[in-house]
Amino acid sequence: LMGAASQSTGYEINQSIRFSDNDSARLARTVSSSGSLTTWTLSGWIKRGRYTSNVNNQWFAVYTASAGSTAYDAPLNFNDAAAGGSFSVYLAGQNWRTTALARDTSAWYHVVTVWDSTNGTASDRMRLYVNGERQTDFSITGSVSSGLNSRWNSSSYSHHRIGNLNYN
């Protein structure tokens, strides 16, 4: 990972990665064939490096995009101070932003995003869990129609990335 190798943490966590906010460090994967676009789960542990007031800064994002396009899905974002330090999810043209805040730079967060657009209960089609607690209070709430495809897992949006949110 460019720019991250020189960062010192004082300790090492196996199978982990640290991104520097001073560069465009990210992991990228090209998807050769699509997985399910209607039912999937994304889970991971994340830690905020710092909390900033930058208006458009997404400090951490997991996202997929198509080269040269501004269309993207971001199943998980840390938001900056302009958005209150919340978590957000952007999928299939819909957006959710939690009222719960993630401002603690010393805390690890276990975050799970569940996309199930086949679920008969509309409010269960996108679920977000932070540290085992389902997030149900959102300042922005998307609406998922039955069977709606996400871009996540799609080979049409072949650039799957973790790190800097830059979709071009």
Q: Which residues fall in each region the model found?
A:
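Extracellular glycan-associated modules
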Residues: 4-168
